């Protein structure tokens, strides 16, 4: 594609002297080759402007800058991140305009809600692309996932592939980092869903206000906003919304959709979805009140995109729990072992509360906190565990460059250190062995924090760690053949 075509919808200072043919738009100077367009972006640890000359030397046809560098083949823009996303979209012939786009954002529940919406659309005959934390799923094909929301080159490559393979919709998790970094700039969504917001990612955003401001961006460019009215900050999302607003709630009758006659069972939830006199019975195979909210978010979104309520209900009834979200490990033990991605204070609290009713014995929780991430949530995680668990084992999560012992020390600040049922074991495998060794019949063991992840980030290494297989190995069971698709 010619430079003049790429810049058709991107304002810039300068003139196109050489209307070169471009086949790659990148912000990574190491990938530059002839016929590339290099975009200079200020990252936290590196300013792409310092690599502009290297990019030109490697054959880049031109560079896009935010700062004036005085280079011959320089196109200066007001916001290079925004330009990057729009240029990648143009290079792929705007596949986002050929799909029905649904974005889901919030601290907790994004993966479950996007998966459920994808299931409902697929069951209704709409081939759908799913992008998110666990995997990218094109129709029935699972593709590897790196970031929760892909960077522009990967995102538009996925969208383009989806269009070419007959997809009519895309459901994506919209992370706060992606929204803050402008990865979704230029996309007009058909629907945006807000699940909830609690403290997370403050290591990146700095303040909670910056965090919620990033989330709001999704609703400024959506024709339809689906908002969880149970969240204390829901009105801020509503105020930021530019399109039609639809609300849902498990408790408030003023919402457009409410949940009535809620039954929280040991392994599922039942409730009636009520709106304007219409009642639809909903079942979803995941416990806890948050599962009601997740199912409501998916159903309300689908219904307002034209899906019949009964069809949405039928799809939810046959949907299974998402990988690493309240996932039960099949291990033939006299106690239950559950794996969940809960890695925030609120997330851990919600999962522990969901498991309590079905726990006939002690509720045992094993967890840690990520290194090089928000340190202020660590004692809050410890406090949540102390409030809801009978036995606590504090261990490592992804310590990254931090000392695991220091991270554990931060967690312990929020606990009652006099508790005789609180244990510390920095080695996660040994901690899992301790949890299983001390579990008794009827107990529930929650392995929190890793969820779908099958690795640990320690130092500069990515080391294999599949908690399912770790449990099975400790118990002397054979290797699992694999988890069934949702």
Place the predicted regions along the sequence by residue.
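Acidic, Mg2+-coordinating active-site environments of NTP-dependent enzymes
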Residues: 9, 65-71, 165, 180, ...
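ATP-dependent carboxylate-amine ligase
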Residues: 1-13, 31-37, 47, 242, ...
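Short, ordered loop/turn segments at secondary-structure junctions
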Residues: 67-69, 133-134, 176, 197, ...
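N-terminal leader/targeting and accessory segments in enzymes
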Residues: 1-86, 90, 232, 258-263, ...
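Short, well-ordered alpha-helix to beta-strand connector turns
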Residues: 22, 34-35, 60, 71-72, ...
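Short gly/ser/thr-rich secondary-structure transition/capping motifs
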Residues: 15-25, 84-87, 150-153, 172-179, ...
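A short acidic, helix-capping loop that chelates divalent metal ions and anchors anionic groups
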Residues: 71-72, 137-142, 199-204, 373, ...
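Phosphate-binding loop of NTP-binding sites
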Residues: 7, 84-229, 233-244, 296, ...
């Amino acid at each position: 594609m010619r430079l003049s075509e790429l810049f058709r919808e991107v304002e810039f200072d300068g003139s196109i002297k050489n209307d070169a043919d471009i086949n790659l738009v990148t912000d990574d100077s190491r990938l530059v080759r002839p016929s590339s367009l290099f975009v200079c972006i200020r990252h936290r640890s590196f300013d792409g402007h310092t690599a502009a000359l290297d990019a030109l030397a490697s054959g880049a046809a031109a560079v896009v800058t935010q700062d004036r560098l005085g280079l011959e083949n320089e196109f200066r823009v007001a916001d290079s991140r925004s330009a990057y996303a729009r240029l990648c979209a143009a290079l792929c012939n705007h596949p986002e305009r050929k799909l029905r786009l649904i974005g889901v954002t919030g601290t907790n529940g994004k993966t479950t809600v996007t998966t459920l919406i994808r299931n409902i659309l697929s069951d209704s005959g709409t081939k759908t692309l799913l992008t998110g934390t666990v995997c990218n799923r094109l129709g029935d094909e699972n593709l590897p996932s790196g970031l929760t929301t892909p960077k522009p080159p990967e995102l538009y490559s996925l969208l383009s592939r989806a269009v070419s393979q007959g997809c009519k919709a895309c459901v994506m998790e919209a992370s706060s980092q992606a929204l803050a970094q402008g990865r979704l700039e230029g996309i007009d969504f058909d629907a945006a869903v807000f699940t909830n917001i609690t403290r997370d990612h403050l290591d990146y955003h700095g303040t909670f206000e910056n965090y919620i401001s990033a989330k709001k961006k999704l609703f400024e460019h959506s024709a339809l906003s689906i908002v969880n009215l149970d969240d204390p900050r829901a009105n801020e999302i509503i105020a930021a919304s530019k399109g039609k607003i639809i609300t849902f709630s498990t408790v408030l009758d003023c919402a457009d959709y409410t949940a009535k006659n809620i039954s929280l069972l040991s392994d599922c939830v039942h409730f009636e979805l009520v709106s304007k006199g219409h009642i639809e019975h909903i079942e979803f195979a995941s416990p806890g009140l948050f599962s009601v909210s997740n199912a409501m978010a998916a159903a309300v979104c689908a219904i307002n995109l034209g899906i019949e309520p009964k069809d949405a209900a039928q799809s939810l009834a046959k949907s299974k729990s998402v990988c690493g979200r309240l996932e039960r490990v099949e291990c033939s033990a006299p106690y239950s072992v559950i794996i969940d991605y809960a890695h925030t204070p609120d997330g851990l609290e919600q999962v522990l509360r969901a498991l309590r009713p079905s726990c006939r014995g002690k509720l045992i929780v094993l967890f840690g906190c990520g290194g090089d991430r928000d340190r202020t949530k660590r004692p809050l995680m410890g406090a949540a565990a102390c409030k809801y668990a009978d036995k606590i084992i504090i261990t490592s999560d992804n310590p990254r460059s931090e000392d695991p012992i220091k991270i554990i020390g931060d967690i312990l600040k929020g606990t009652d250190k006099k508790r005789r049922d609180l244990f510390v074991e920095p080695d996660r495998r040994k901690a899992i062995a301790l949890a299983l060794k001390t579990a008794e019949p009827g107990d529930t063991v929650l392995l929190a924090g890793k969820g779908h992840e099958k690795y640990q980030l320690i130092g500069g290494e990515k080391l294999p760690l599949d908690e399912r297989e770790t449990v099975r190995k400790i118990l002397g069971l054979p290797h699992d053949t694999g988890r069934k698709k949702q």
